[in-house]
């Protein structure tokens, strides 16, 4: 049986691109997300992509995923489910949004890692890939809930690497900078397409979801003794979180 790669948040964007790429490179992909219609479209593309409708904020759903994978060669878990849900200052923000952001990004990853790491240990090898963000390396205005959550995921990856020392399980954190996907900015701005478009305005070549998928593929296909602790990837136009070269229209 082919080695299994489980990818969360796989109905669109980075998750869907990663599912396609790993399926092309010899993995049996179990793609999980909440939106069944999107998952059905994904599984129709490749017989090596299996899908399950799973909400990572649900203990019951994640246990269902673990039960489905019992006795199977689970080697890769890509914790990609996440998102930003506001662009408010700390003072004007809604604490419920902070709770949601932390649950989806951090606790959702914890649930999946707790459920699937024992399967990797039993199989004899595994690789946990946590998709964070450059927002986990710095702070910026109006991004408190997301910045806090991504810092939490960075801490999660570093802690896991220490706690799993001695086991044949790799832990990699991949921190993308500016990635232009169909949904991230739209979700952050509650569907306001004009505000979302301004994020990428004038940036000649932001990263794409396929670029991040390639970084994930590269890291998981390295020799098994080789661990990438963390990887930061940005478009050339983004020198730092706050420094983005934009081409202005004349």
Regions found by a protein language model. Give the residues of each.
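Substrate-binding pocket helix/loop in short-chain dehydrogenase/reductase
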Residues: 88-90, 94-99
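Conserved glycine-rich Rossmann-like NAD(P)H-binding loop of the short-chain dehydrogenase/reductase
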Residues: 25-40
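Conserved glycine-rich cofactor-binding loop
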Residues: 11-12
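Active-site helix of classical SDR
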Residues: 113, 149
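Alpha-helical segment proximal to the catalytic Tyr-Lys
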Residues: 118, 162-165
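C-terminal helical subdomain
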Residues: 173-174, 193-242
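Residue(s) in the substrate-gating loop at a strand-loop-helix junction
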Residues: 133
């Amino acid at each position: 049986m082919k080695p299994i790669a489980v990818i969360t948040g796989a109905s669109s964007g980075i998750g869907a691109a990663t599912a396609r790429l790993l399926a092309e490179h010899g993995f049996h992909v179990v793609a999980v997300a909440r939106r069944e219609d999107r998952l059905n479209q994904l599984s129709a593309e490749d017989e090596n992509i299996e899908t399950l409708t799973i909400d990572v904020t649900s203990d019951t759903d994640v246990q269902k995923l673990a039960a489905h994978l019992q006795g199977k060669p689970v080697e890769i878990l890509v914790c990609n489910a996440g998102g930003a849900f506001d662009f408010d200052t700390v003072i004007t923000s809604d604490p419920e949004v902070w709770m949601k952001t932390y649950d989806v990004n951090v606790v959702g990853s914890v649930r999946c890692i707790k459920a699937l790491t024992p399967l990797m240990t039993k199989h004899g090898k595994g690789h946990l890939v946590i998709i964070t963000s450059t927002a986990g390396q710095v702070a910026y205005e109006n991004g408190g809930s997301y910045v806090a959550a991504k810092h939490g995921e960075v801490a999660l990856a570093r802690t896991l690497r220490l706690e799993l020392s001695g086991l044949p399980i790799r832990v990699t954190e991949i921190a993308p900078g500016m990635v232009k996907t169909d949904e991230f900015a739209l979700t952050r701005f509650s569907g306001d397409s004009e505000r979302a478009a301004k994020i990428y305005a004038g940036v000649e070549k932001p990263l794409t979801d396929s670029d991040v998928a390639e970084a994930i593929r590269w890291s998981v296909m390295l020799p098994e003794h080789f661990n990438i602790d963390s990887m930061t990837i940005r478009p050339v136009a983004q020198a730092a979180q706050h420094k983005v070269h934009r081409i202005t229209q004349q």
